[in-house]
Amino acid sequence: NICMDLWCSRGKSTKKVKDMVRGHQMENMSGVRKLQPNLRAQPMVLDPFSINEVDYILASHYHSDHIDINVAAAIMNNPKLEHVKFVGPWHCTELWKKWGVPEDRLVTVKPGDVISLKDVEIHALDSFDRTCLVTLPVEGSENKNGELSGLCPSDEEMGRKAVNYLFKTPGGNIYHGADSHYSIQFAKHGKQFDIDVALNNY
């Protein structure tokens, strides 16, 4: 059993906060300063503390709507789930570590890595999430007071922030594009793998 990008938090619950945190990805991507007015409108129907059967918790990237402290706490506090591994790029495993997940339960992946779980093969692939690309920290921004102008993050840096996944299963192959933006690189993945179902959030 694999759990992918499960977010059980409520997101923005107030409109009292007017300005984005300095360096917020939406500010860096579009230049806006005011926080979006959207609030999470629907309740989360899945209680993470009711999860009793799972083998891997996967995160595609470290934005808070794809990696959840509540899910990590639920897994870590359930004695039935002491075997569960947390899989994601470097920024995700660092976040899980900060939340108390021990090192021996973390699996850090980068594009090109392959892990196996029983009869499922999981391929970590390049992500095209340009929003994640401009999320701090970005190498060199600390010397520019958090500004990104003139900086070009490397492929290696992007691989530490976000990945897409391909799940090879006996029943077919599932591609998870996470928050990747529209890109001609999807064609590369489509030619590289025989994909039966493709999922994309963006």
Show the residue positions of the predicted features.
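Short hydrophobic/aromatic-enriched beta-strand-loop microsegments
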Residues: 4, 85, 103-112, 197-201
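Active-site-proximal loop/helix segments of hydrolase catalytic cores
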Residues: 70, 145-202
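Metallo-beta-lactamase
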Residues: 80, 88-171
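Structured loop/turn residues at beta-strand edges in well-structured enzyme cores
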Residues: 49-52, 118-120, 160, 193
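Structural motif
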Residues: 2, 55-56, 120, 172-174, ...
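Short, hydrophobic beta-strand segments that form beta-sheet elements in well-ordered domains
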Residues: 85-90, 175, 179
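Pre-active-site segment of Zn-dependent metallo-hydrolases
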Residues: 2-58, 62, 69-77, 131-150, ...
